[in-house]
Amino acid sequence: MSDSSQIRIMIVEDHFVVREGLKAIINSQKDMLTVAEAGNGRQAVEAFEQHQPDVTLMDVRIPGLNGIDAIGSIVAKFPNAHVIVLSTYGGDENIFRAFQAGAMAYFLKDIKGQDLVDAIRAVHAGQRVVPPEIAAQLAGRVPLTALSPREMEILTLVAKGKSNKEIGAKLAISEGTVRVHASNLLSKLHCSGRAQAVSEAIRRGIIEVE
């Protein structure tokens, strides 16, 4: 099969071993070829512009510009981009935001090799692919009242174990203001306490904690 008839694929993944594994699966297919790789979101956007692959495999949690924002940047410039998300994380907000950004498929990284290459072919043909476990997450999604940037900052700091005093000092606001924002975000997440809010936010992919 000639190169012109192969599906040209870009892999965006910050873990070398995972990237090499994906490349081996792809390059074992006669109708597929890896044409570009990237280890972070900014590299992904630049590599897409340079190579304009037929299908992109995109991790969500990558350094710098995250995968979802990278998808948004790519699709904004190339509306016909075909992106498949491969992620360790299946939180409903992650999934929702990925599709909202322009992804055509979302899979967890435990996907079998044959299922992956089948999905690549389907997405290349213009089909959206939503496996049952991902569809179930979307179906059960509770719409999130958007957290403000300040609430997101506070939630992330709470997740890191910071006290109201420490949060206030870091953000240059009073402890009282921290408490008000914390109360608001608890209400939006439908949680009764901070520990529950952090657990829920991580589970749903609203925040990331290193």
Predicted regions and their residues:
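Conserved acidic carboxylate
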Residues: E13
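Acidic, metal-coordinating helix/loop segments flanking the phosphotransfer/catalytic sites
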Residues: E37-V55
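Short, flexible helix-to-coil linker/hinge segments that flank and couple to helix-turn-helix
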Residues: E93-Q100, M104-E153, I206
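Short, conserved "switch-loop" micro-motifs in signal-transduction and mechanochemical regulators
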Residues: Y89-G90, G176
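Active-site residues of response regulator receiver
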Residues: D59, S87
